A protein has these predicted regions:
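Short hydrophobic beta-strand that contains or immediately precedes a catalytic carboxylate
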Residues: 1
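C-terminal accessory segments enriched in acidic
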Residues: 87-102, 112-221
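Short, solvent-exposed loop/turn elements at domain surfaces
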Residues: 7-8, 217
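Active-site/substrate-binding loop(s) of hydrolase catalytic cores
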Residues: 8-150
C-alpha cells in the first residue's frame, strides 16, 4: 500500500485488513493455508512529505507527495537491481523471496482532480483527468501466449467477483449509476473512441492483450 504516498486510504485499508485477520474467527486458519505479506507503506519518503504538507491544508490532494523524495515514479524501478531508488527494492525482494501467486497494489483517491477546461493543461496518459468524477472501472492486462491461456478465464472470474461485490453495497451502486450517466452524457456520447465504454454489470472494464515479455514494466506481463 501507499506506493503513491498522497493516497492515504491505501494504508488505512491495509491496517483494517490486518485487524480483521487477527480478530475475526473466520480467518483464524488462514495462516495454515497461505503466506500473506502486507506492506502498509511502501513510499515512506513521500509519506513524510505528505505529512508535513497536510498540517496546513489537510483536505488538499498534494500530488507533489505522490512520488518519492526525488520526485520519481519509482514503479519503473522495480526489479532493477542497480536502482538508486532504494524503496523500489521492497517489492523486488518480496517477489524474490515469496514468488507470490497474486499481488494486490492498493491505491486510493485522496481528492478530485480538477483541471480548468481549455487552460492548456495536458496529461497524455490520463484523459480521465478531464472528468471531475468517474465511475468505478477496471483494467485487465492479460497475456495472449498459448502457454498462458488459462489466465484469461481466471481474469473473467475476477471480473465477476469484483462487480458482484461492488453491487452488494447500495451506496456504491447508486453512485456508480449516477456517474455512469454523467460519463455517457459528457464523455462517451461525444468522443466514444477517446472514452470507450465496455459495460459489464454496471462497471466499465478495459481488456488489454499483451504478449508475454519478461522485460515489461508490469510483472504480470
Amino acid at each position: 500500500a501507499r506506493h503513491h504516498a498522497n493516497e492515504v486510504s491505501s494504508t488505512n485499508a491495509a491496517f483494517i485488513l490486518i485487524k480483521k485477520l487477527l480478530t475475526e474467527d473466520v480467518y483464524k486458519d488462514l495462516p495454515d493455508k497461505l503466506n500473506l505479506v502486507i506492506v502498509p507503506m511502501e513510499n515512506v519518503d513521500g509519506a513524510a512529505i505528505h505529512y508535513e504538507l497536510q498540517k496546513e491544508h489537510p483536505n488538499w490532494k498534494f500530488h507533489v507527495a505522490r512520488f518519492n523524495s526525488l520526485g520519481k515514479e519509482f514503479y519503473y524501478e522495480h526489479f532493477q537491481q542497480d536502482t538508486i531508488h532504494s524503496e523500489a527494492m521492497g517489492l523486488t525482494r518480496i517477489y524474490d523471496r515469496y514468488v507470490p501467486d497474486m499481488i494486490v497494489d492498493n491505491h486510493g483517491v485522496p481528492s478530485h482532480e480538477w483541471e480548468q477546461q481549455f487552460s492548456g493543461y495536458t496529461s497524455p496518459s490520463y484523459k480521465g483527468f478531464w472528468l471531475p468524477r468517474s465511475l468505478l472501472y477496471g483494467y485487465f492486462w492479460y497475456v495472449t501466449n498459448p502457454e498462458y491461456k488459462d489466465n484469461y478465464p481466471v481474469n473473467k472470474v475476477m471480473e465477476d467477483v469484483i462487480a458482484d461485490k461492488i453491487a452488494e453495497y447500495p451506496e456504491m451502486r447508486e453512485l456508480n449509476r449516477e456517474w455512469s450517466a454523467q460519463f455517457e452524457k459528457y464523455a462517451h456520447a461525444w468522443m466514444p473512441k477517446l472514452f470507450p465504454a465496455n459495460y459489464y454489470k454496471e462497471m466499465i472494464n478495459y481488456w488489454i492483450p499483451f504478449a508475454a515479455d519478461p522485460n515489461h514494466r508490469l510483472s504480470l506481463i
